[in-house]
UniProtKB/Swiss-Prot annotation:
GO terms for cellular component: cytosol; extracellular region; host cell cytoplasmic vesicle; host cell nucleus; plasma membrane. Belongs to the low molecular weight phosphotyrosine protein phosphatase family. Phosphorylated on tyrosines 128 and 129 by PtkA. Both Tyr-128 and Tyr-129 together are essential for PtpA phosphatase activity. In vitro, can be phosphorylated by several eukaryotic-like Ser/Thr protein kinases, such as protein kinase A (PknA), which phosphorylates PtpA at Thr-45 and increases its activity. Changing C16A: Does not affect nitrosylation. 80% decrease in phosphatase activity. Changing C11A: Loss of phosphatase activity. Inhibits its dephosphorylation activity on human VPS33B. Reduces its effect on phagolysosome fusion in infected macrophages. Does not affect nitrosylation. The gene is ptpA. Changing D126A: Loss of phosphatase activity. Inhibits its dephosphorylation activity on human VPS33B. Reduces its effect on phagolysosome fusion in infected macrophages. Still binds V-ATPase subunit H. The keyword Secreted applies. This is Low molecular weight protein-tyrosine phosphatase A. It is an enzyme of class 3 (hydrolase). Keywords: Host cytoplasm, Host cytoplasmic vesicle, Host nucleus, Hydrolase, Phosphoprotein, Protein phosphatase, S-nitrosylation, Secreted, Virulence. Phosphatase activity is stimulated by phosphorylation. Inhibited by sodium molybdate, sodium orthovanadate and sodium tungstate. Inhibited by S-nitrosylation. Subjected to substrate activation, triggered by pNPP or by phosphotyrosine. Is also activated by phosphoserine, with serine being ineffective in enhancing PtpA activity.
Amino acid sequence: MSDPLHVTFVCTGNICRSPMAEKMFAQQLRHRGLGDAVRVTSAGTGNWHVGSCADERAAGVLRAHGYPTDHRAAQVGTEHLAADLLVALDRNHARLLRQLGVEAARVRMLRSFDPRSGTHALDVEDPYYGDHSDFEEVFAVIESALPGLHDWVDERLARNGPS
């Protein structure tokens, strides 16, 4: 049995955007029967919130949409940098990951998976200083991009063969 495919989401503090994406994507994969085939993690580029729960507003939006909320913030480390795919929530995160030595082919912007993002900026705006509606907007942006990420996973799993 081969190791599971590893996808990690990266934002600034790992308490808002990346844990939302992680929880949403991981649950969707479990519902598709791929929970053992794909490992989903998240991390922040900074260490300010290491060990903290997700922001209560992020957790509230996840809970309202039926997603789990258990989370402990982490800073990007060796485990995350070794992921098959590192999904950056904004351009600064992508740049930092490349500066840390991650090959450009393994770094993607989350919104690049949403074909409807078109002319919109690829950044997912940080809702930290916003209100509930900003967190709902982040949820909607993530939700729109995840089908494309599922397609990426399906293609990788098909190419790599069954685990």
